[in-house]
């Protein structure tokens, strides 16, 4: 799952098999040109019979009363011109003052998303077809939705995330997203930007767990074309999640208390602040291998997680290896 390339997690062989199973397509080969031809023929027939087309909006221009759709495939143009009714869904943060402002954003979006200078298709829609027009919808409706975006705008920190132009650059450079993919986030917006937007839009209680995905390496902040400090915002959201935002870190009534997490950190603190305890913990860490292998399936806390993941084995001589590392001062 990727906001620019939704099928990036599939290769051409898998896509060919999906076309064969779902569309009944006869595949001579699974070359990209052949797959594109199948998709084009199938979708065109669907578009010709549609009465209503639903699209998103890249940028809306209030002065001109128009909105801008960017694409490379052509399906967006079919969706907005072939049906009699076109409904465009637009987040309030995508509204610009003028065409010039939107053009500046487009000049950032396309190179950051796909490396192109300009997209293949630029659709600037000003309304339904006029008298004498041969094509286009008879009705155009624009729905502006908020979904807590105005609350983000009023926040002293999180308003910066509303600058996002949905280029996906932060995902392309995120080492965590590269390993787990977009579906692991289980939200509309994956990757670093999703870790900021999703808790604000859908609620930190519902999507706050994805904040733990971030390694805080900061690569996303470096490549963002609109300079959103993503790593800093993720860190602030983590503080909010555990009740340490604007509230006292100790004794705050709204702390999302997790007894097991609190116990684990308490034990870690005991070991990490005493040299002899820390050395003892490292020397016995390999016993954890037996615990994982024999008890992981029985403990409901980690049963589901371990069904899809496999922990690396801890070496028996880990303590000695750490001592032997050059430059490490071990007290």
Stretch-by-stretch model annotation:
Residues 97-100, 111-118, 172, 179, ...:
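Acidic/polar loop patches that form or flank catalytic/metal-binding clefts of enzymes
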Residues 164, 168-171:
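Phosphate-binding glycine-rich loops and their immediate beta-loop-alpha structural context
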Residues 117-121, 249-252, 296-301:
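Short coil/turn segments at secondary-structure boundaries
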Residues 1-157:
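The feature marks the mature, well-folded catalytic cores of soluble enzymes
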Residues 285-331:
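Short linear elements at protein peripheries
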Residues 63, 172, 222:
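Short alpha-helical basic/polar micro-motif
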Residues 132-161, 176-296:
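Ferredoxin-type iron-sulfur electron-transfer modules in oxidoreductases and energy-metabolism complexes
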Residues 40, 123-130, 266-270, 305-309:
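Amphipathic alpha-helical surface "interface" segments used
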């Amino acid at each position: 799952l990727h906001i620019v390339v939704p099928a990036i997690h599939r290769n051409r062989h898998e896509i060919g098999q999906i076309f064969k199973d779902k569309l009944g397509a006869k595949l001579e080969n699974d070359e990209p040109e052949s797959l594109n031809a199948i998709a084009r023929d199938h979708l065109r027939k669907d578009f010709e019979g549609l009465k209503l087309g639903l699209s998103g909006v890249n940028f809306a221009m209030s002065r001109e009363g128009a909105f801008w759709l960017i694409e490379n495939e052509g399906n967006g143009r079919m969706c907005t011109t072939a049906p009699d009714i076109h409904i465009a869904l637009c987040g309030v943060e995508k509204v610009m003052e003028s065409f010039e402002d939107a053009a500046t954003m487009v000049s950032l979006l396309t190179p950051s998303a796909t490396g192109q200078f300009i997209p293949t298709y630029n659709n600037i829609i000003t309304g339904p077809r006029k008298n004498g027009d041969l094509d286009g919808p008879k009705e155009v409706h624009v729905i502006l939705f908020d979904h807590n975006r105005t609350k983000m705008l009023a926040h002293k920190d999180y308003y910066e995330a509303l600058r996002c132009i949905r280029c996906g650059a932060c995902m392309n450079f995120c080492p965590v997203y590269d390993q787990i993919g977009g579906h692991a986030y289980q939200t509309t917006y994956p990757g670093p930007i999703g870790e900021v937007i999703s808790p604000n839009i859908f609620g930190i209680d519902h999507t706050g767990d994805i904040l733990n995905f971030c390694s805080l390496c900061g690569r996303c902040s470096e490549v963002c074309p609109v300079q959103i400090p993503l790593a800093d915002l993720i860190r602030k959201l983590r503080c909010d999640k555990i009740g340490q935002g604007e509230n006292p870190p100790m004794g705050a009534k709204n702390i999302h208390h997790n007894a097991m997490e609190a116990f684990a950190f308490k034990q870690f603190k005991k070991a990490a602040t005493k040299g002899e305890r820390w050395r003892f913990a490292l020397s016995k860490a390999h016993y954890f291998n037996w615990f994982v292998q024999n008890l992981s399936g029985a403990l409901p806390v980690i049963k589901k997680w371990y069904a899809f993941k496999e922990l690396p084995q801890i070496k028996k001589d880990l303590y000695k290896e750490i001592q032997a590392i050059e430059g490490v001062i071990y007290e």
